[in-house]
């Protein structure tokens, strides 16, 4: 057991799977000699060689497409994009090739690919380096979308993503890459890619979040507990497929739902969760569900970034509004 950052946990998972399975390869810009833009792949090339840790040109479409070719020929590529906002040139390959290969070939050919990238605001970077567009990929049939919120989750979820027979979008919240540490056991045990995790039980309010927002949610839950408001906190972890069973069970217990995410609110994952809860558990609700999201705008430059990010006080205020708001 080691105390490590989320970034170190990602690196550990990559090491583990490359040792376990010789078909696992890593590719991307600067992933080899330099160990990646955030050093997530540091040490891999020295240990596994240039044939399994491949530096690519600055061409995201190429990275996405080469990964498809590798996967269809029996390899298990882990392709890194330096930031989520850089994935867009590779969208055609991801959506039209990787996501549809199993269906197109009636299951004869699959694409066991992990597309990794950091995502989110909070590191004083402009918009291409601060995107939160997980909803775009969650809309695509054939893709899994996974977002860890802690080092332990990052390790276990990445192991399972690499072992999955279909393409997985694995988005890592760069805001907490190095800002937190927790114990991680290199036991090779993956976490399921179809369940959310209950981080805190509660009776009054269900709060669903993922990624870096979990840190603010947990702090807000502690603050609210001092005011005798007990929040049940669910870490979604896997955006697609949604673990609606766990969400619905929690909402039926608490009667209230707050969804918190950094991405803009319109047509987002929060809207999908609220719609599903309203369809399937309307009579259990004591108040209308609420979303607390980013604004419908590009992430601002760093001087105004603090006004864009959701704080624990924002979450606490939203929780109070839910507790005070009742159906007419």
Regions found by a protein language model. Name each.
Residues 1-167, 171, 176, 307, ...:
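Thiamine diphosphate
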């Amino acid at each position: 057991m080691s105390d490590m950052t989320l970034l170190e946990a990602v690196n550990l998972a990559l090491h583990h799977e490359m040792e376990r399975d010789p078909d696992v390869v890593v590719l991307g810009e600067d992933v080899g000699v330099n160990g990646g833009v955030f050093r997530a792949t540091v040490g891999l090339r020295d240990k596994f060689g240039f044939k399994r840790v491949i530096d690519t040109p600055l061409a995201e479409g190429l990275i996405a497409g080469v990964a498809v070719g590798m996967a269809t020929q029996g390899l298990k590529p882990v392709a890194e994009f330096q930031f989520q906002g850089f994935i867009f040139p590779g969208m055609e390959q991801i959506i039209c090739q990787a996501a549809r290969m199993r269906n197109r070939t009636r299951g004869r050919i699959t694409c066991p690919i992990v597309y990794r990238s950091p995502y989110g605001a909070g590191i004083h970077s402009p918009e291409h380096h601060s995107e939160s567009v997980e909803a775009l990929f969650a809309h695509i049939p054939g893709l899994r979308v996974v977002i860890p919120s802690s080092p332990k989750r990052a390790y276990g979820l990445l192991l399972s993503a690499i072992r999955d027979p279909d393409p997985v979008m694995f988005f890592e919240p760069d805001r907490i890459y190095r800002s937190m540490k927790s114990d991680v056991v290199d036991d090779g045990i993956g976490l399921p890619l179809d369940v959310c995790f209950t981080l805190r039980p509660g009776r009054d309010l269900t709060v669903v979040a993922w990624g870096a927002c979990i840190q603010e949610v947990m702090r807000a839950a502690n603050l609210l507990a001092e005011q005798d408001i007990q929040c049940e906190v669910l870490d979604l972890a896997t955006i697609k497929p949604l673990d609606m069973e766990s969400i619905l069970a929690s909402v039926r217990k608490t009667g209230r739902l707050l969804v918190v995410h950094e991405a803009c609110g319109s047509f987002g994952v929060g809207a999908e969760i609220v719609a599903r809860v309203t369809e399937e558990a309307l009579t259990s609700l004591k108040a209308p569900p609420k979303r607390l999201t980013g604004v419908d705008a590009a992430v601002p430059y760093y001087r105004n970034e603090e006004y864009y990010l959701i704080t624990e006080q924002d979450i606490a205020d939203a929780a109070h509004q839910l507790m005070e708001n009742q159906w007419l």
